[in-house]
């Protein structure tokens, strides 16, 4: 699986992303719940009863064969703020999904790079073991000829055993990395995802500047989510204050009365079908201490969120500056590792030429090959460290998912 395929699948089916989407859907449904009181609610029932004497009420209503009631909010400022708060919470939940996608994309890319590194390191370790095996065979021949001590053969055998042990360890690390990558993508623990050998383009390099940090702060989903929470708390505070405002409700009801409840005996006029529609006005006179407590609580929580927002902004700015420094350090290390590898490869070419001329034994050539493999591992480590550092910069600036999706 390529890096692009792995990240694309991860941002779709990773459990953390799925849970964030479910939270977003819950927040959207809460908006519908908050709007419900403004929709007419109609209930139909019956208060059927037999009356002996005066027709007394049944649950506050006269006895009736069929009874229907309808009610809804017409003006309720507190509930309107509750709806606005629910909408803001839904918007913040959407930002949480976007932030989780960036986080999962970076985690998946890091695991992919780790799995690819373990795979390549394992291949080089097996080559080292093969080279050391050839050295052991050469030393064994020298021991038989009396040109080397048996101790040298034992030391060579120990080197072979250590190389094989390292290869097995790297193979186990590769399997663990592939399993971790499968879990990040959203597969099961029984699955493994092996990276595809590909020539990926180097992640784009961003330049550090005031505009870069400012744009990253404006685009960061975590900061925007905190800003959304602060706005929601402001609406909650205004909604708590609105509890002191009057409210107007729509009320309507219909009753089908019976003739066996003695209405004719006690009322001059009687009709079976009865209905009424109107509005109910409520004006709070003494709201109690709860309103002021709710307002103070919302103010306190809003102040707490503002402190968290300031801390998150400072931390993000510091992380961005540190990430750019890490990119520069990794880039320098990659250049040094590349030069070191070139020297090792040139040395191996010289040793091979001397061996063909009979001026150098096979043992020294294989040792040079082992040294070259070690330089290859160091070179790969430096390249992967640079790649991960640049992915981290893209994550902090909010461009990671979009950049990876443009990969071939």
Feature locations, PLM:
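Amphipathic alpha-helical coiled-coil segments
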Residues: 19-34, 100, 104-125, 134-141, ...
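Small/polar, glycine/serine/threonine/aspartate-rich low-complexity segments that form flexible
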Residues: 45-74, 82, 195-206, 238, ...
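Periplasmic alpha-helical coiled-coil/stalk elements that build and connect Gram-negative outer-membrane
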Residues: 103-215, 326, 330, 350, ...
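Metallo-beta-lactamase
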Residues: 170, 221, 305, 382
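Long amphipathic alpha-helical coiled-coil segments
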Residues: 180-188, 388-403
């Amino acid at each position: 699986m390529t890096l692009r395929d792995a990240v694309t699948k991860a941002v779709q089916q990773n459990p953390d992303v799925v849970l964030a989407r479910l939270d977003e859907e819950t927040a959207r449904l809460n908006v519908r719940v908050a709007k419900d009181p403004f929709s007419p609610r109609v209930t139909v029932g019956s208060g059927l009863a037999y009356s002996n004497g005066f027709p007394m009420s049944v649950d506050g209503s006269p006895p009736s064969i069929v009874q229907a009631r309808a009610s809804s909010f017409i003006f309720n400022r507190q509930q309107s703020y509750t709806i606005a708060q629910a909408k803001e919470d839904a918007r913040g939940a959407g930002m949480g999904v976007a932030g989780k996608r960036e986080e999962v994309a970076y985690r998946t890319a890091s695991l992919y790079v780790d799995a690819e590194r373990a795979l390549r390191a394992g291949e080089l370790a097996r080559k080292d073991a093969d080279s050391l095996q050839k050295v052991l065979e050469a030393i064994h021949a020298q021991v038989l000829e009396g040109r080397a001590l048996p101790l040298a053969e034992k030391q060579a055998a120990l080197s072979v055993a250590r190389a094989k042990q390292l290869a097995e360890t790297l193979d186990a690390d590769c399997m663990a990395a592939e399993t971790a990558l499968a879990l990040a993508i959203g597969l099961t623990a029984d699955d493994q995802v092996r990276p595809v050998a590909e020539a990926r383009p180097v992640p784009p390099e961003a330049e550090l500047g005031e505009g870069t940090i400012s744009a990253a702060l404006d685009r960061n989903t975590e900061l925007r989510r905190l800003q959304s929470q602060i706005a929601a708390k402001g609406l909650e505070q205004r909604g708590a204050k609105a509890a002191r405002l009057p409210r107007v409700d729509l009320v309507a009801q219909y009753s089908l009365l019976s003739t066996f409840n003695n209405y004719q005996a006690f009322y001059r006029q009687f009709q079976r079908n009865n209905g009424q529609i109107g509005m109910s006005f409520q004006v709070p006179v003494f709201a109690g201490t709860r309103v002021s407590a709710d307002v103070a609580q919302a103010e306190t929580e809003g102040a707490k969120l503002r402190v968290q927002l300031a801390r998150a902004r400072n931390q993000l700015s510091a992380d961005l500056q540190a990430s750019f420094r890490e990119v520069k350090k990794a880039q320098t290390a990659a250049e040094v590792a590349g030069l070191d590898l070139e020297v090792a490869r040139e040395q191996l070419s010289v040793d091979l030429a001397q061996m063909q001329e009979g001026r150098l034994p096979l043992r020294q050539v294989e040792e040079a090959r082992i040294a070259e493999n070690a330089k290859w591992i160091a070179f790969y480590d430096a390249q992967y460290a640079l790649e991960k550092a640049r992915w981290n910069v893209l994550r902090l600036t909010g461009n990671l998912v979009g950049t990876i999706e443009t990969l071939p």
